[in-house]
C-alpha cells in the first residue's frame, strides 16, 4: 500500500545491499505492469511495507536543500548588517550562493508544476468517483442493486474520496511550504 492506504500491488522481490539495507522492491502492479521502487521510498508500518509517494520524497528533499541555502544567505545578510564581514566578502559569498538560489527558483517552479498536476489528477479522480457514487445511488433507488451491494460499494468509494482529500491536503501544505520566498528577491 502507499502512505494513503491505496493498494500498489504484490511484492515480487526485494533487492538488498551487503548490509541488508533495501535497495529496491519489485512490484506486480496489476494492469500497470511491473514496477521497481527505490528502497528509500519503502518504510514499514506495523510490519507492512508502505510506499512513500515520489512527490513527497522529492518535496522533502527539496525543502531540506532549500532550507540550507536560505539559512546561508540569511546568515550572510546578518553578518554584513552587523559589520562582521566587509561588503566585498558579502558580495563574494553571496554570488557564490546565488547560483544555488537560482537553481532553487527553477527547481521550485518545476516542483510546483508537478505538485499542481498531482492535485488536478486527484481532483479529477474524486470527481469521477462522485459521479460513480451518484450512479450507484440511482441504481439503488430504482432497485437495480441491493442494499448490501450499494453499502459496500459506497463505503469503498468513500474511502477513495477520503484518501484523495488527505493527499490533496498534504500536497497543498507542501505547495504552501515551497512557495518562493522573499529571500530570492532580496538577493537580486
Segments (PLM) and residue ranges:
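Peripheral interaction segments used for macromolecular assembly
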Residues: 1-186
Amino acid at each position: 500500500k502507499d502512505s494513503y492506504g491505496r493498494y500498489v500491488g504484490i511484492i515480487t522481490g526485494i533487492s538488498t545491499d551487503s548490509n541488508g539495507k533495501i535497495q529496491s522492491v519489485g512490484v506486480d502492479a496489476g494492469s500497470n505492469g511491473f514496477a521497481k521502487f527505490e528502497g528509500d521510498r519503502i518504510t514499514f508500518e506495523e510490519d507492512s511495507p508502505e510506499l512513500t509517494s515520489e512527490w513527497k520524497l522529492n518535496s522533502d528533499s527539496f525543502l531540506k536543500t532549500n532550507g540550507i541555502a536560505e539559512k546561508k544567505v540569511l546568515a550572510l545578510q546578518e553578518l554584513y548588517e552587523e559589520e562582521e564581514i566587509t561588503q566585498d566578502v558579502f558580495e563574494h559569498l553571496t554570488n557564490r550562493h546565488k547560483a544555488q538560489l537560482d537553481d532553487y527558483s527553477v527547481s521550485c517552479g518545476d516542483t510546483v508544476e508537478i505538485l499542481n498536476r498531482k492535485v488536478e489528477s486527484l481532483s479529477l479522480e474524486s470527481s469521477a468517483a462522485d459521479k460513480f457514487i451518484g450512479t450507484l445511488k440511482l441504481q439503488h433507488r430504482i432497485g437495480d442493486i441491493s442494499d448490501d451491494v450499494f453499502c459496500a460499494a459506497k463505503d469503498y468509494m468513500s474511502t477513495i474520496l477520503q484518501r484523495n482529500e488527505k493527499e490533496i491536503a498534504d500536497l497543498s501544505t507542501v505547495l504552501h511550504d515551497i512557495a518562493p520566498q522573499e529571500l530570492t528577491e532580496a538577493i537580486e
